Amino acid sequence: MLNILDAKMKTLTNGNKHTTLKLLSNNNLNRFIVKTFSIDDVKSWKPSPDPYLMVTNHYKVKPENTLMIACHSWDLEGAKNVGLQTGYIKSYEGGLSHSRSIPDYEGDNILELAENILSIQEDQIIAT
């Protein structure tokens, strides 16, 4: 499913960049990721604005044209606070635990989330 989307995915981690790259490689996900960002680059932990804005600034895109997918509600809230669109994978926390932000998209797992994103975007394309 991920290769069908032909999405240019990036990761943004509170963890060590090297550890994240190894984790992606060990799970054969590195082929879908074009760049990995770490909070080490901005010396500020998510959900503060700096890590999210580092990514949008790097690619010179507006936050509202960027989609952050996460399984932690606090991460989605940080992304929403800087204007990013958000997608929530519910299977990790089981639901939005303490977030005041409602995600733009959600799914029980990554495949369901991707299907929901594609379905909504198809509806928007047809409606315009």
Region spans (language model):
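Asp-based, Mg2+/Mn2+-dependent phosphohydrolase catalytic module
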Residues: N3, A7-K8, N16-K17, L21-T128
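Conserved phosphate-coupling serine/threonine residues in phosphotransfer and NTP-handling enzymes
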Residues: T13
